[in-house]
Amino acid sequence: MNLTPREKDKLLIAMAAMVARRRLERGVKLNHPEAIALVSDFVVEGARDGRTVAELMEAGAHVITREQVMDGVAEMIRDIQVEATFPDGTKLVTVHEPIR
């Protein structure tokens, strides 16, 4: 399988998000990379589903709560920026204060 670096990054984020979901199901708090992966995957999949940039910017801030992450993680993540493929092209989506 010949994947571009961007495709490899997308797969890595998707896999990390799957791990994060499993940990949340078990009641395990997420660390920094897992939290970023979960929000990023939400944005990428939302774009593929046809949601707008504005919808994803708002909804992305409600994917995880402070109670679901380890101490200090919420303060470490001020913004998450994700390049996502929408029906009309690739756009940069910024989720401000993604863990509330």
From Swiss-Prot:
Pfam families given in the database record: Urease_gamma
GO biological process per UniProt: urea catabolic process
Example of a GO cellular component annotation carried by this entry: cytoplasm
The protein's enzyme class: hydrolase
CDD domains, per database record: Urease_gamma
Matches recorded under InterPro entries: Urease_gamma (IPR012010), Urease_gamma/gamma-beta_su (IPR002026), Urease_gamma_sf (IPR036463), Urease_subunit (IPR050069)
Metabolic or biological pathway, per its Swiss-Prot or TrEMBL entry: Nitrogen metabolism; urea degradation; CO(2) and NH(3) from urea (urease route): step 1/1
EC number: 3.5.1.5
Catalysed reactions, semicolon-separated: urea + 2 H2O + H(+) = hydrogencarbonate + 2 NH4(+)
Keyword field contains Iron-sulfur: no
Subcellular location: Cytoplasm
Keyword entries, A-Z: Cytoplasm, Hydrolase, Virulence
GO molecular function: nickel cation binding; urease activity
Assembly: Heterotrimer of UreA (gamma), UreB (beta) and UreC (alpha) subunits. Three heterotrimers associate to form the active enzyme.
Family per record: Belongs to the urease gamma subunit family.
HAMAP family referenced in this protein's UniProt entry, alphabetically: Urease_gamma (MF_00739)
Reported function: Disruption of the ure1 gene cluster suggests that it protects brucellae during their passage through the stomach. The major route of infection in human brucellosis is oral.
Protein name: Urease subunit gamma 1
Lineage: Bacteria, Pseudomonadati, Pseudomonadota, Alphaproteobacteria, Hyphomicrobiales
